[in-house]
Amino acid sequence: VVVHLAAVHRDDVLDPMDYQRTNVDGTANIAQVCVEKNIRKMIFTSTVAVYGFAEPGADENAPINPFNEYGRTKFEAEEILRSWQQQGDRSLIIVRPTVIFGEGNRGNVYNLFQQIASGRFVMIGQGRNQKSMAYIGNVVAFLNQCLSTTQHNAVYNYVDTPDLDMNTLVQQVRLQLNGRDGDGLRLTYWLGMVVGYMADGWAKLSGQRLPVSAIRIKKFCSTTAFSSSKSNLDGFTPPYRLEDAIKRTVDSEFINPDPDREIFYTE
């Protein structure tokens, strides 16, 4: 069995062809090796980015409408693997996770939590937009169950429920860290976008990667709420509740950090 996790997915990649070379050409290479080695089962981690800015509650049958090169190339990779699967007695399980977080994961959720912990966080927009999230411990458990399933061809979004709006998420993290809730300073959406475009201009001129960009602010303020049929995978039940997963992550990263823990940089 091949579990295909590799991808270029940062939103500040300087050469757009990096997405094509890794996500598409790299996947084609893996499929070819599977043919040569007679490997007949693959689990492919794609992304909900293939749906773009989808309607809230989008499921696995939602229209494919990626808004960036990451989503486009990941769907192209899916199509390559579907062709591979259809050419013989082969099994393909495609998993489309939403944003993943957890201990040791340096991604967008960690960046948000770090800003809150530092006291420098500024809320942008009304904060009522919902965000689907996925805890790494649950994603790993789901992929592990994919290894043993007898299904031959399936697509699953991976989402941990319930979806939280940004106000609730920020308040929950701030309460755990500081013993008080509230969301602190706030900018309007349009002012936040002005800051984002200014940051984009500076990044282009200086060649520096900045933590703020227009696309990141747009994604932060958008609703990205998805539904999932993951329970159809042999009755799968995630081992961690979302609320507990957030608490575990905040505690591990900011309250009782382990200096020897391995770190994975995904953003």
Question: Would you name each region that the model predicts?
Answer:
Residues 53, 65-96:
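Active-site Tyr-X1-5-Lys
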Residues 51-52, 90-111:
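Flexible, glycine-rich beta-alpha linker
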Residues 102, 124-129, 156-164, 174-175, ...:
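Glycine-rich Rossmann NAD(P)(H)-binding loop
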Residues 29-69, 93:
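Conserved Rossmann-fold NAD(P)-dependent oxidoreductase catalytic core, especially the SDR/UDP-sugar
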Residues 136, 171, 195-236:
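Conserved C-terminal active-site "lid" loop/helix of NAD(P)H-dependent oxidoreductases
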Residues 146-211, 246-250, 256-267:
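Mid/C-terminal beta-alpha module of Rossmann-like enzyme folds, strongest
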Residues 1-25, 33, 51:
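NAD(P)H-binding glycine-rich loop region in Rossmannoid oxidoreductase-like domains
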Residues 29, 105-111, 125-147, 154, ...:
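Substrate-positioning beta->alpha
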